[in-house]
């Protein structure tokens, strides 16, 4: 190891450089099986024999390591390379965010890239590498736009959520239960459209009331290689052939996607004017904002909002009473729902972060090593060679029992007070929660907006209701949540 300093970059717990590994070197365990067939076998394990969580847990146990080699979906023929080094602990995971050592170009969704035809033929910002000048321009536009719109976040959210409560109460009254997911999807889409499209209601545009359904279809066709429908009447081999073997064509959503694009293009003049000043063509800028609003933000909220309601609902009346007291006291003192009032709600903030820890909206991160790297987990150091793919499975990394006490349990107080020091291990935004997105990284530009929306959802809920009951199940993406009862506020 005499020449290690010249050959490798050492990544420790805080991704700082060191001259020698602080932990003993260990060969990365695992294997890829027989060429081609090994990838197919692992794909079947992932989708049909084990499921995603057990797929990674079983290999972690088999190799007695949180760093190991395996194939990940989709494999042939959607992805050129299915061979990865998997990271499932909180210590090694941050290497995925160090863009000086890894490259995320083309790896937004996993080990594959959907066709640019889904985005007007453009390679949108999510797929660009940080060294690409266009990435700097586009992400800078995203960040400056969100900064400019900051004062509109709360008013637009308040406008959008009113119809959600009306729908929720009406359905509960008529049917005895209310399925939250489509109602939450409508809230998310309406808020994001109004935010970027100068306050316009999407119903009054070319998408009409079908915005969420159009985005769902558009996103599904791109993420199909990672999804299993779970239909009992469809043989596994047939579903695998259709969804996981070859890319699904854009033509299946072209007409609807054009409606979505037109609605944004005709409603965001100010943003497109600003893009032109930066040298970005109007249609390219529009496709990037459709991706930001539809794939990034709406797609994430589609998982996040039901999870948030699920965890709060199943925590019961005692947590609800504490949230009611904190929220209504702060709102009364501030004279309304304001940013300053929300900042005085540590329990609300902790509940939102704990939800993002338990159920990160984007479970997979993929990067390619730019050079030979030595990473560490809790026990050992490992060499990852240049051009190897590194794959993070976040739902295990953020439940690392050596970092979080009772890591598999939802603890609403986890990030209150001194617990805030653990926020550096919350990675849902493709970065540490304590970091802020910049033009030089791949962290979600809407990171703070998504957290604020979660906090606002909790605040608005408990301004109207004292408690509620839910039941939940699983969907293709995230949790299925159904309200069984709502108790309106008594004070």
UniProtKB/Swiss-Prot annotation:
(13S)-hydroperoxy-(9Z,11E)-octadecadienoate binds at residues 296, 302. It catalyses: (13S)-hydroperoxy-(9Z,11E,15Z)-octadecatrienoate = (9Z,13S,15Z)-12,13-epoxyoctadeca-9,11,15-trienoate + H2O; (13S)-hydroperoxy-(9Z,11E)-octadecadienoate = (9Z,13S)-12,13-epoxyoctadeca-9,11-dienoate + H2O; (9Z,13S,15Z)-12,13-epoxyoctadeca-9,11,15-trienoate = (9S,13S,15Z)-12-oxophyto-10,15-dienoate. One of its GO terms (molecular function) is oxidoreductase activity, acting on paired donors, with incorporation or reduction of molecular oxygen. Induction: Not induced in wounded or jasmonate-treated leaves. The keyword Heme applies. InterPro entries: Cyt_P450, Cyt_P450_sf. GO terms for biological process: defense response; fatty acid biosynthetic process; oxylipin biosynthetic process. Keywords: Fatty acid biosynthesis, Fatty acid metabolism, Heme, Iron, Isomerase, Lipid biosynthesis, Lipid metabolism, Lyase, Metal-binding, Oxylipin biosynthesis, Plant defense. Expressed in roots. Not detected in aerial tissues, including cotyledons, leaves, stems and flower buds. (13S)-hydroperoxy-(9Z,11E,15Z)-octadecatrienoate binds at residue 296. Its cofactor is heme b. SUPFAM superfamilies: Cytochrome P450. Changing residue 297 to A: Strongly decreased AOS activity, but gain of a hydroperoxide lyase activity. Cytochrome P450 metabolizing both 13- and 9-hydroperoxides of linoleic and linolenic acids, but with a marked preference for 9-hydroperoxy fatty acids. Catalyzes not only the synthesis of allene oxide, but also its hydrolysis and cyclization. The first step is the synthesis of (12Z)-9,10-epoxyoctadeca-10,12-dienoic acid (9,10-EOD) and the final products are (9R)-alpha-ketol and the racemic cis-10-oxo-11-phytoenoic acid. PANTHER family: ALLENE OXIDE SYNTHASE 3, CYTOCHROME P450 26. Belongs to the cytochrome P450 family. This is Allene oxide synthase 3.
């Amino acid at each position: 190891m005499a020449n290690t300093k010249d050959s490798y970059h050492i990544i420790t717990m805080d991704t700082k450089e060191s001259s020698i590994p602080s932990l003993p070197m260990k060969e990365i365990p695992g294997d890829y099986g027989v060429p081609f067939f090994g990838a197919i076998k692992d794909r079947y394990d992932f989708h049909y024999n084990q499921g995603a969580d057990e797929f990674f847990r079983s290999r972690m146990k088999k190799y007695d390591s949180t760093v190991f080699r395996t194939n990940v979906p989709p494999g042939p023929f959607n992805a050129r390379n299915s061979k990865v080094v998997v990271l499932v602990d909180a210590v090694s995971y941050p290497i995925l965010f160090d863009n000086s050592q890894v490259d995320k170009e083309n790896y937004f969704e996993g080990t594959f890239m959907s066709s640019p035809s889904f985005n007007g033929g453009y390679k949108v910002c999510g797929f660009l590498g940080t060294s690409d000048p266009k990435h700097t321009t586009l992400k800078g536009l995203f960040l400056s736009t969100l900064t400019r719109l900051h004062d509109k976040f709360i008013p637009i959210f308040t406008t959008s959520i009113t119809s959600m409560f009306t729908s929720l109460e009406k359905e509960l009254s008529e049917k005895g239960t209310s399925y939250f997911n489509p109602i939450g999807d409508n809230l998310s889409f309406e808020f994001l459209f109004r935010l970027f499209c100068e306050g316009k209601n999407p119903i009054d545009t070319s998408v009409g009331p079908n915005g969420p359904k159009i985005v769902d279809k558009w996103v599904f066709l791109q993420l199909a290689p990672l999804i299993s429908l779970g239909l009992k009447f469809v043989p596994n081999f047939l579903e695998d052939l259709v969804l996981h073997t070859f890319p699904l064509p854009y033509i299946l959503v072209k007409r609807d996607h054009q409606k979505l694009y037109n609605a944004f293009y005709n409603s965001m003049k100010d943003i497109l004017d600003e893009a032109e000043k930066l040298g970005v063509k109007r249609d390219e800028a529009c496709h990037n904002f459709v991706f930001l609003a539809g794939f990034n933000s709406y797609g994430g909220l589609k998982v996040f909002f039901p999870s948030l309601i699920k965890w709060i609902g199943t925590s019961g009346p005692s947590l609800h009473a504490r949230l009611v007291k904190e929220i209504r006291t702060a709102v009364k003192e501030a004279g309304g729902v304001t940013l300053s009032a929300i900042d005085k709600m540590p329990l609300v903030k902790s509940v939102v972060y704990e939800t993002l820890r338990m159920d990160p909206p984007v479970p997979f991160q993929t990067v390619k090593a730019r050079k030979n790297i030595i990473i560490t987990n809790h026990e050992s150091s490992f060499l990852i060679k240049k051009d190897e793919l590194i794959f993070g499975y976040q739902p295990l990394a953020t439940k690392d029992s050596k970092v979080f006490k009772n890591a598999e349990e939802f603890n609403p107080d986890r990030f209150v007070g001194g617990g805030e020091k653990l926020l550096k291990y919350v990675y849902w935004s493709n970065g540490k929660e304590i970091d802020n997105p910049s033009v030089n990284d791949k962290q979600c530009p809407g990171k703070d907006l998504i957290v604020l929306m979660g906090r606002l959802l909790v605040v608005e809920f408990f301004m109207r209701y004292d408690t509620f009951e839910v039941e939940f199940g699983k969907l293709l993406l995230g949790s299925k949540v159904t309200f069984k009862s709502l108790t309106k506020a008594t004070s």
